Amino acid sequence: MTLTESSRKGSALAQFQQIYRWQLKRSRLISILCLGLTFLCFSVVHLCKSVRSYHDYFDNPSELGENVSHAYLLKQFAGTIQANLMTGMATILIPLLLVFLVVSAIQTFQYMHKRRSVDLFHALPIRRTPLLLGNMAAIGTVLGGVAVLNLLLCGAVDMAMGAEYSICWLLGQLGYLLLLLAASLCGTVFLLVACGTVSGAVIAGILLTVGWPLLVTCGAAIIRGSLPGSQLVASGAVLTALTPYLALFVPYSVGGEMFLSAALFGDPTYDSSGSLGGNVVTVWLILWWVLVTAVLLAGCILAYRKRKSEAAENNFSYPGLRIVIRFIISGAVGLGCALFFGNLSGSNVVFYLTAVLASGLTHVITQVVWVREVRELPRSLLYYAALAVAMAVFFVGLATGGLGYVNRIPAEGDVDYIRVDLPGYHFDDSKETYLYSRTRSLTVDTVLPEDEDVMYKDDVTSFSVEPKLQKAKSIQTVQALHQTILS
């Protein structure tokens, strides 16, 4: 009775502030460790590279050739520094921050997965919502502070040395990083709340992070192979729409989806506007992650309020999460195995049979190993039946023309141009030869104006040439050919 009365006296804001300050003090050691590691491994390394680049470009300009303009050197130096910064963020800073995020979240919320600890924490004179949000805010403060300090330090030193990349660009990179870190934190805490054990939450995060991109990639590859003329390539935003951990790397990836698709399925089709290497962070992408972060935060609050103490040391406090993740990973493995063995055998029967068997086997394995409820296996087959129906609808839709996609000929007014994809010449069977043969280049001698910011005034310039048909008569001819093929 005493605990109940005392819990009503303090406001939610006051309780939040107490938990926030207590958690910051409690985690100061790991926070200092995170700051020290990121400073040493990211900032110091980047600044050393910047000093080395400055020395190469400005202290010994004669090594780059004669008649090199200072403006050209400054431009090249800025580009090198910017590329080094993005590389360091993708390979050092973001992975370290993610490791700190996961470790801190598990350390902070592990009391929810121990029956004695959860009873003790829930008996404290404090409401659940301030307890949850105070801990999350403390972790987010450390993450954001470390990211801001490192990036602003590197940016300030780079600009002092003459790097001309925009401060708006740097703030944009920082803003995207902070937003996705917030989404990753909310997603991690949601998994910890929804699962009854730490191991269950970790496995759920791994399955979701691997399963969704694999499902999207395999689905896009099947659509390309089934619908003539389709050049669908899953964009980085779609591949990482449900995985904020991977979405952190989208602006820093270079052609990742293209090479992944070619390596897995042998499909050389590549569209720069739809690849992971587009490096485009659109307003819609930002709005999407703002919405996802808000939904995950609300889900954390609602789930934690209704979470029973008896859920500790159980597999799941909310079984609905395992149904969704199992659906995704079973479908991804089924489609992936179907593509592999279908291409290997060249048989449609093998393709469909493998899709059914692989997805069913994955469903059984996740039920037995991850969920650990063998007695519930017969009942869980109802959810696998839903997956089988969804896959059947997908395959039937593709077999019947993709809802009219195959038979649709765009109107002449809707066509800006038609790209001609020439077959090229093959010298051997290597991927490099194929990619080289698909590249058309034109080399010309170019004399540029005196005020042009280039290394040499007289230069040989190479242009990438892509055959296009833009005249009305050419478009009409191709449309007639398309209609003839359909007929």
What is the predicted role of each segment?
Residues 1-35:
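Aromatic- and glycine-rich beta-strand/loop motifs that create alpha-glucan
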Residues 2-6, 12, 48-82, 214-303, ...:
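Terminal transmembrane helical anchor/hairpin motif
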Residues 83, 137-201, 205, 213, ...:
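Secretory targeting signals
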Residues 88-117:
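Long, hydrophobic alpha-helical segments
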Residues 108-141, 312-313, 481:
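Helix-loop-helix units of permease transmembrane domains in multi-pass membrane transporters
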Residues 199-212, 356, 379-391:
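Central hydrophobic cores of alpha-helical transmembrane segments
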Residues 326-333, 364-406:
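Internal/C-terminal transmembrane anchor helices
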Residues 380-387, 397-487:
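Function-determining sites in protein domains
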